[in-house]
Amino acid sequence: MNPTIYLSCLMVFSVFLLGKVNAENEDEFVTEKQRLFSVYGDSSVDEATKYRNIDSLVTFYDKYFTRLQLKPDLNTRAHDLLRRYKEENARVVLVDGTPAQGGFWLPLVKLLIVQLGVEIASEGVKRAIES
């Protein structure tokens, strides 16, 4: 096969794959954002559900924090809380695969993360109403 045709086909295929990956990432971002917004933005959702979704919220923020348009003070608080959460999670002692009972700081940090999630969701509602 002619090298020019081969390289052209390879380039078109590469651009197609990159566009598809970018579209999948965008879909994943929008889907997860909507799911977390429905958890933390809805006051009828119980606290247990919010606590169960903390890991998802932390993962989402780590992955997409550059795409979230938060106020600088809220962004700073989020970074600080997530850093503390990861530090406390790293200190958790597992007994037969489950965390040992006790400990004061991790539940406190989880409470603060839930409150942060609610605050970020309410900020999103305010922006949606304003625009």
Curated annotation (Swiss-Prot):
Pfam families: Turandot. One of its GO terms (cellular component) is extracellular space. Residues 1-23 form the signal peptide. Keywords: Immunity, Innate immunity, Secreted, Signal. It is found in: Secreted. Induction: By a variety of stressful conditions including bacterial infection and heat shock. GO terms for biological process: cellular response to heat; defense response to Gram-positive bacterium; innate immune response; response to bacterium; response to heat. Belongs to the Turandot family. A humoral factor that may play a role in stress tolerance. Requires Mekk1 expression in the fat body to regulate response to septic injury and consequent immune response. This is Protein Turandot M. The gene is TotM.
